[in-house]
UniProtKB/Swiss-Prot annotation:
CDD domains named among the record's database cross-references: CIMS_C_terminal_like (cd03311), CIMS_N_terminal_like (cd03312)
Pfam family, one: Meth_synt_1
InterPro entries named among the record's database cross-references: Cbl-indep_Met_Synth_N, Cobalamin-indep_Met_synthase, Met_Synth_C/arc, UROD/MetE-like_sf
Source organism per UniProt: Blochmanniella floridana
Main enzyme class: transferase
Organism ancestry: Bacteria, Pseudomonadati, Pseudomonadota, Gammaproteobacteria, Enterobacterales
Disulfide bond sites: none
Role description: Catalyzes the transfer of a methyl group from 5-methyltetrahydrofolate to homocysteine resulting in methionine formation.
Keyword Transmembrane: no
Entry protein name: 5-methyltetrahydropteroyltriglutamate--homocysteine methyltransferase
Length: 769
């Protein structure tokens, strides 16, 4: 049987982010719903044809999404959060989907959006399903069936994609005060899946890809037993199931997996050994398809196809084999061929989504032709990777000075020498901070004019003087706005930054940036990760001129905002030829240099953002302690040499911090702000446990991603809850994230209400403002 090619999913956003632009135009009522639907159909058809032209035998259907594939699954199961039922008579399915994701209002009553959470260990965000006890699911698969009919018109084999029932339950949350077992909902859920399977079998669908990435985790035994029960129930002879796992190894689950009633297994093999492949081949039922996920869907480096040919060649004679991407190519940019500004030698090291499809075909061709003793295809594979082998000795990637500096610093103790209680007194005296200090996270609204200005400067259409003058004008406006609001710690607003990671990537050696390497983060939000190609250093100061200019405009402290080493690494396409902890160490030394220069220039408040610290945590608990040890040490390297009266802040995304409270405490930052406003109950649990242990904390007091403007009373209610667990001299008041995606009108009202709430609290404590 020939080796078949497939992928688990394809990017949705379009080559030039057409989906992003269409969504935002629709939300702003600039295009009609029909126009939006037309753009969606156009993108799907284009993407399917791109896959077919690249040699993919089975194209995935159902991987397209208007906002998020997990939310799509909730809609398909008619799992609409109770608070949105009031909209059911006024909203069609598409608009209900947007309301759940973004929030809404009716009769002047705010309906809060569902929580947004990171998709396993990626920078993609999904909308968290919400469950209530005794919930009944009902099928609503109109969108999926429409897409299947569109795809069938191409007369090419297709493979519908569904999120599996156990993973769907695992990643969701109960919405009732009293916890209940989510597995109690499985019987109702399985009835809907059976209904979907029956409908698809009538359309003569042969294969369904059913995604169960939760299997890479170390699951409780009750959940593993539920897998056996679920796939017994779902088994039918009319349709075949490819059980799909990704984002890690699943060997610890093989005793359960090999008992499941499925027809094939897809495994992420990007971090496997030869022994792993042999183990899989030996243990899995011989009648199963083994789908080898050998093309890394989360990174942009070429694959050593010849090496994989040698590993897989013997298996092709013994079992049915498919070759695919490790995970969905959702996490990869679309097409390397439209990158016109990358150095050709460097560009030749990379593969984006379309090129990854071609890689899969190349390997399949070689494995299939090998049956005829044809060595031509093998030679093609060898030549394909030659440039990446030569890269390892290139001066572009190797910097002996950086490597030597890393050796010298790695064994030192990087703890701050003075306890926080002493530092806090020095810092509050230096800045004359009131009780409940107010601040923001860093960025302020980025208008189209700012973006155009940056683009013109990047394309050398304006000179440096013109650019600097106009950026300074924006900074001046941002400082003035904050002073009008009477915030306590100001920021310069980051008008010079396109993205918190890409900006530093553009200013550090060891990085390159693409023009069109966009990937989806959530909804219409796209990011363009920089690419780490070599050893990292900071040739000149990066932020000093902007921060110092901002500080010259005000007597209030201005925070220097830097992105931390773990986040820069995690949100970049990282090199794969050295360990991740070494990449992070190089970044820490570069950021440390920037921290010290900020302090020398007179900046006394410095924020090192690490929203990705928790995201980088390995999915398996048994592997987490090693990561946390080096990740915490990496952060400490960036700040260990600052003076006691320099206040160090960090900003993080809340995500199950309860599991790593002790490690968060080891950071020993002076102030931690947390993006958490959509997770109020979980945040309160964290605060209950850690509130009195943490130094100072600024829980995100409102959700900047929602269109809802918080009232003074809403903010006051939240603050009163928080003050039950946080000492009043340790509570800071701030939004939950940067403000760059909001408009000035939106943020003025929200920040004004936030400041009034802080002042009211001070008055209630018998203090002056």
């Amino acid at each position: 049987m020939p080796v078949l090619s497939h992928i688990l999913g394809f990017p949705r956003i379009g080559l030039y982010r057409e989906l992003k632009h269409a969504l935002e135009q629709y939300w702003e009522k600039k295009i009609t719903e029909n126009k939006l639907l037309d753009i969606g159909r156009m993108l799907r058809m284009r993407h399917w044809k791109q896959q077919i032209n690249s040699g993919i035998n089975l194209i995935p259907i159902g991987d397209f999404s208007w906002y998020d594939h997990v939310l799509d699954m909730s809609i398909m199961l008619n799992n609409i959060p109770t608070r949105f039922h009031i909209l059911s008579q006024k909203k069609n399915t598409l608009n209900m989907l947007f309301s759940i994701a973004r929030g809404d209002s009716i009769n002047n009553t705010t309906i809060t959006p569902s929580e947004m959470k990171k998709w396993f260990n990626t920078n993609y965000h999904y909308i968290v399903p919400e469950f209530v006890q005794n919930q009944i699911f009902k099928l609503n698969c109109t969108q999926l069936l429409a897409e299947i009919d569109e795809a069938l018109s191409l007369n090419h084999p297709i493979k519908p994609v569904l999120l599996g029932p156990l993973t769907y339950l695992w990643i969701g949350k109960t919405k009732e005060t009293k916890e209940f077992d989510r597995l109690s909902l499985l019987p109702s859920l399985l009835l809907v899946y059976k209904e979907i399977f029956n409908i698809l079998s009538k359309k003569n669908i042969q294969w369904i890809q059913i995604d169960e990435p939760a299997l890479v985790l170390e699951l409780p035994q009750t959940w593993l037993k539920a897998y056996l029960h679920a796939y017994d129930q779902l088994y039918q002879t009319k349709i075949k199931l490819l059980l799909t796992t990704y984002f890690g190894k699943i060997y610890h689950q093989l005793p359960i997996i090999k008992q499941l009633k499925v027809n094939g297994l897809h495994i992420d093999l990007t971090n496997c050994s030869d022994n792993d492949i042999s183990l899989l081949h030996e243990q899995l039922p011989k009648k199963w398809i083994l789908s080898a996920g050998i093309i890394n869907g989360k990174n942009i480096w070429k694959t050593n196809l010849y090496d994989w040919f040698l590993k897989l060649n013997t298996i092709t004679h013994q079992r049915s084999l498919w070759i695919g991407s490790s995970c969905s190519l959702l996490h990869s940019p679309i097409d390397l061929n439209i990158e016109s500004k990358l150095n050709n030698n460097i560009k030749n090291w990379f593969a984006f989504a379309i090129q990854k499809c071609s890689e899969i075909k190349l390997l399949c061709d070689a494995l299939n032709s090998n049956h005829n003793d044809n060595s031509d295809q093998q030679n093609i594979l060898k030549k394909y990777y030659n440039t990446n082998i030569q890269r390892l000795n290139s001066n572009i990637i190797n910097n002996p000075q950086v490597q030597e500096r890393c050796k010298n610093i790695i064994t030192l103790d990087h703890s701050r020498k003075t306890k926080h209680i002493t530092r806090m007194k020095l810092q509050h005296n230096r800045f004359n901070l009131p009780l409940y200090p107010t601040t923001t996270i860093g960025s302020f609204p980025q208008t189209s004019e700012i973006r155009k200005l940056r683009l013109k400067f990047k394309n050398k259409q304006i000179n440096e003087d013109y650019y600097y003058t106009h950026i300074q004008q924006y900074i001046k406006k941002i400082i003035q706005e904050q002073e009008k609001l009477d915030l306590d710690i100001l920021v310069h607003g980051e008008p010079e930054r396109n993205d918190m990671v890409e900006y530093f990537g553009e200013n550090l050696k060891g990085f390159v940036s693409s023009q069109h390497g966009w990937i989806q983060s959530y909804g219409s939000r796209c990011i363009k990760p920089p690419i780490i190609i070599g050893d990292i250093s900071r040739p000149i100061p990066i932020t000093i001129p902007w921060i110092n200019y901002a500080q010259s405009l005000t007597n209030k402290p201005v925070k220097g905002i830097l992105t931390g080493p773990i986040t820069i690494m995690t949100w970049s396409f990282a090199r794969e030829d050295i360990p991740r902890h070494m990449i992070a160490l190089q970044l820490a030394l570069a950021i440390r240099d920037e921290v010290m220069d900020l302090e020398k220039s007179g900046i006394g408040v410095i924020q090192i953002d690490e929203p990705a610290l928790r995201e980088g945590l390995p999915l398996k608990k048994s592997e987490q302690s090693y990561y946390l040890k080096w990740a915490i040490n990496t952060f400490k390297i960036t700040v260990s040499s600052v003076k006691d009266n320099t206040q160090i802040h960090t900003h993080m995304c809340y995500s199950e911090f309860n599991e790593i409270i002790d490690d968060i405490l080891k950071l020993d930052v002076d102030v931690i702000s947390i993006e958490s406003s959509r997770s109020d109950l979980q945040l309160l649990q964290f605060i209950k446990t850690a509130g009195k242990k943490l130094n100072e904390i600024g829980p995100g007091i409102y959700d900047i991603h929602s269109i809802h403007q918080p009232s003074i009373n809403e903010i006051m209610d939240k603050l009163k809850k928080l003050l039950q667990y946080i000492p009043k001299d340790r509570l800071w008041i701030n939004p939950d994230c940067g403000l760059k995606t909001r408009s000035w009108n939106e943020i003025r009202e929200s920040l004004n209400n936030m400041v009034i709430a802080a002042k009211t609290l001070r008055i209630n404590n018998g203090l002056n403002n």
